[in-house]
């Protein structure tokens, strides 16, 4: 039976969501990605969030949680959020190894649910855009059919759609070759369902807020390394790691804000030419 997570939403109340993405953790906590210790940057982000953790009703982790595909990396992710009271749901990114991801996160009590009902007004659907072994994304026929079924059976619910890969160009040609390859097929499905108003992704390690045929498309900074916007070639940014908060309101509106660490201690090796 398909796993469904249900969250209450009373009256005109809002549901507050924390998005964490692209943590790129390793089995060994001392390891670094492009000069940034990803465990330490993840911990710093969580410490910045922790004073406000009681405000969140749900945590969404939108892929690339591990860099080395190890079970230990996913255990470290779970360790980081263990003190947060909000449930967490997740989806895979191109760097993730799903068997280890599923097993380690489930063992840690993190839900494998790919559908979340929020009161009577909202649903969140989590898609798997991973094509294992390559950086670009694609939604399988199964995923597209699953999406269409879930949208059709809840037409009264405002819908937030989550996936790892960005379906629209971000303006970085080196990144955009690794986007969602069959975004047109996704658009065809979504065109049938006007209650899908928002999409949220990770992958591009930078903030993005675009209109996609009347839908709002959001992307969020990584908790570690940042990619510099509007660059044709691989370029790292020196801006601090970040995360996103979102509020879903009973009337179908969404408000959101990107947050970043206040200091600049997590500086990448800007001479790096890729990873």
Curated annotation (Swiss-Prot):
Binding site for Fe cation 2: 64, 94, 164, 203
Cofactor(s) this protein requires: Fe(2+)
CDD domains: MPP_GpdQ
GO MF annotation terms: 3',5'-cyclic-AMP phosphodiesterase activity; ferrous iron binding; nucleotide binding
Keywords for this protein: cAMP, Hydrolase, Iron, Metal-binding, Nucleotide-binding
Binding-site positions, Fe cation 1: 22, 24, 64, 205
InterPro entries reported for this sequence: Calcineurin-like_PHP_ApaH, cAMP_phosphodiest_CpdA, CNP_phosphodiesterase-III, GpdQ/CpdA-like, Metallo-depent_PP-like
Catalysed conversion reaction: 3',5'-cyclic AMP + H2O = AMP + H(+)
EC number: 3.1.4.53
Cofactor detail note: Binds 2 Fe(2+) ions per subunit.
Residues at which AMP binds: 24, 64, 94-95, 205
Family (UniProt): Belongs to the cyclic nucleotide phosphodiesterase class-III family.
Protein task: Hydrolyzes cAMP to 5'-AMP. Plays an important regulatory role in modulating the intracellular concentration of cAMP, thereby influencing cAMP-dependent processes. Specific for cAMP.
HAMAP family per the UniProt record, alphabetical: cAMP_phosphodiest_CpdA
Protein's name in the database: 3',5'-cyclic adenosine monophosphate phosphodiesterase CpdA
Species whose genome carries this gene: Escherichia coli (strain K12)
Species classification: Bacteria, Pseudomonadati, Pseudomonadota, Gammaproteobacteria, Enterobacterales
